[in-house]
Design a protein with these regions (language model features):
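Soluble "head" domains of membrane/secretory-pathway proteins
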Residues: 2-9, 13, 43-292
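Juxtamembrane cytosolic face of transmembrane helices
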Residues: 34-37
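Hydrophobic membrane-insertion alpha-helices, especially the h-region
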Residues: 10-32
């Protein structure tokens, strides 16, 4: 009887120990190496189809380390990255936390909502949309999927013929921040500078409209436009030097994708990682292919 009890205890001990080690390894891999993501919509068609899943590569940019409990409870927290083997590149398919929580005018990392889009603009780029197509100054490469942008171009040209007055276009056709001074649309916008660390800008009315939310997120202070002057803490602010990197994230299915055209730039710290391989799909020929 004693030997049987010892055997049972031994089995239970090793089962619990093995289970704990496997659980620990799983979470270490989740934090430092990879995790799964799901595409519920067709916003990344044809690269990713609805109801497909892939793995995130966290090694390229380096895995993020932060206090998830402080983040969940709204307390101040710092995001750091482990060393990676590369950096964000133009054209990378990325997975990131949606940059808003309850308030749509205040940048905050949303822990419960993840997006998968393509980084068509990276820190330091000057981005434009010309007749529906993405362009970065100094870059001759095709950004995104040209056939999808052509589809958007044709649709918007029809809209333009039907209603030449841009101010009367429907909301989904208007570009962030949807201000009449800019009058930008998803057909034509820019140029827009995508800030990187140490980028310095003049705080005129246009830049106040474009970058107010990011400056407020970086400083924790309100930035106001008062009497034709940008004001912070009651004092005029003529210029600002950014402390963080940002990117412009866009869905490949340009005619139907909620992305940076509508909610603005994504702080680089909100990026979980770069999309790696596709592991769940109804098309067996696509399974385990690299996501590009």
């Amino acid at each position: 009887m004693k030997k049987i009890l010892e055997k049972i205890v031994n089995i239970v001990y090793w089962t619990v120990t093995t289970g704990f080690i496997l659980f620990l390894v799983y979470w270490i891999l989740q934090i430092t190496t990879t995790c799964s993501f799901h595409t519920p919509s067709g916003s990344m068609t044809p690269t990713l189809l609805p109801d497909e899943s892939g793995l995130v590569n966290k090694w390229k940019m380096g895995a993020r380390i932060f206090n998830i409990f402080d983040a969940a409870e709204g307390r101040p927290y710092e995001i750091r990255r482990l060393p990676g083997y590369g950096r964000l590149e133009r054209g990378d398919v990325i997975v990131f936390n949606y940059p808003y929580q309850d308030r749509k005018d205040s940048i905050a990392m949303n822990l419960g909502l993840y997006y998968c889009k393509r980084a068509v603009g990276i820190p330091g780029d000057t981005l434009e949309i010309i007749d529906g197509f993405y362009h970065v100054r100094g870059c001759l490469d095709t950004l995104g999927v040209a056939s999808e942008q052509r589809m958007l171009q044709e649709y918007m040209q029809e809209q333009e013929q039907h209603e030449p007055d841009i101010s009367r276009w429907r909301s989904w056709m208007r570009f962030y921040p949807k201000d009449p001074q800019l009058n930008w649309t998803i057909k034509d916008m820019g140029p827009m500078l995508i800030p990187e660390v140490n980028t310095e800008i003049e705080l005129d009315r246009k830049n106040w409209l474009l970058y107010r939310r990011y400056i407020e997120w970086e400083t924790g202070r309100k930035l106001q436009w008062r009497d034709s002057v940008t004001v912070m803490d009651g004092k005029p602010l003529k210029t600002y030097r950014f402390k963080e990197n940002y990117c412009f994230a866009a869905g490949d299915h340009a005619i139907d994708s909620r992305d940076s055209r509508y909610f603005g730039l994504v702080p680089e710290k909100f990026i979980v990682g770069v999309a790696g391989i596709l592991w769940k799909t109804k098309d067996g020929k696509r399974r385990f292919r690299a996501i590009k």
